[in-house]
């Protein structure tokens, strides 16, 4: 079990580095490689519409992955509450950095996507630890 948990921790730290790099890069790294155009952002799926709100699907997926790796790494430890705060702050701060990064722009749909990705995994985690005995 420790080897699996260590595997998830390495994945979590690696995913943090990748996500922060992708967020702080002026333009789109994926667009540079896939389309030979750093101004085009590839879409995995269409954005999500909830009432009048648009939620960036790419951002939801990225933060679901990051939060899942974090929860798998730190569940049943004292660090889980710190992890939750860290992920919420990271999701907000990274999007706020887009205000000052060249060729990037702050978008509420991206911010909502980040936060929704974190909330979904945390809700599932809280339900599982409450109703499923491990």
Task: Specify the residue positions occupied by each region the protein language model found.
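Bulky hydrophobic segments
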Residues: 1-111, 115, 119-134
């Amino acid at each position: 079990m420790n080897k699996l948990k260590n595997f998830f921790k390495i994945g979590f730290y690696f995913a943090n580095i990748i996500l922060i790099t992708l967020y702080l890069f002026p333009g789109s790294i994926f667009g540079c490689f896939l389309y030979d155009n750093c101004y085009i952002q590839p879409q995995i799926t269409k954005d999500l519409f909830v009432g009048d709100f648009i939620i960036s699907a790419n951002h939801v997926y990225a933060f679901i992955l990051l939060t899942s790796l974090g929860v798998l790494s730190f569940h049943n430890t004292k660090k889980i509450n710190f992890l939750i705060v860290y992920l919420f702050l990271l999701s907000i701060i990274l999007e706020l950095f887009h205000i000052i990064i060249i060729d990037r722009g702050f978008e509420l749909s991206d911010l909502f996507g980040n936060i929704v990705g974190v909330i979904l995994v945390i809700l599932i985690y809280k339900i599982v630890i409450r109703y499923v005995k491990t």
